[in-house]
Amino acid sequence: MGRVYENISKEQARWIGKQPMFFVATAAPDAHVNVSPRELDTFRVLGPNRVAWLDLTGSGVETIAHLRADGRITLMFCAFEGLPKILRLYGRGEVREPGDAGYDELRPSFPDLPGERAIIEVSVGRIADSCGFGVPRMDLVGPRDKLLTSTERKGPEKMAKYRTLKNTQSIDGLPGLGPKHP
């Protein structure tokens, strides 16, 4: 199967929108390789070679740190039900924190969610699909709400302290969120 495309087609964008999650892979020189799962409700296809997602506060900051150091990123979407398929978007990512250039332009594209820390914008240079025959079929039970309820319970002040503690540098000591982050 494995085809390569120059642009994200409307059909591919619709298919992406039906997937409940995606995976983000990044690496910086001489650092650990990182792969993180993300929920799709925060992901947007902004154009044929441009995507972004609203990044929520987590216990690590590897994706942000790696993008600041290197910029390379791969996003992977898998069909867990229906016809088997894997779609990968290869590109270069930019971190847009509140107050950064481009953040205010992108922000209206996303829902208001507690704990947002940045928008990750990706310029996609390669789109490739593959058969997905090795991806298991799974039934989605539903989203987990623990991240959102925990963030709401802590409130903005405690979340800012948490980000200072957990999100200012990666596990390899690379810079994560900037000091201006609320």
Whereabouts are the PLM-identified features?
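Binding-site signature for planar aromatic cofactors or substrates
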Residues: 1-182
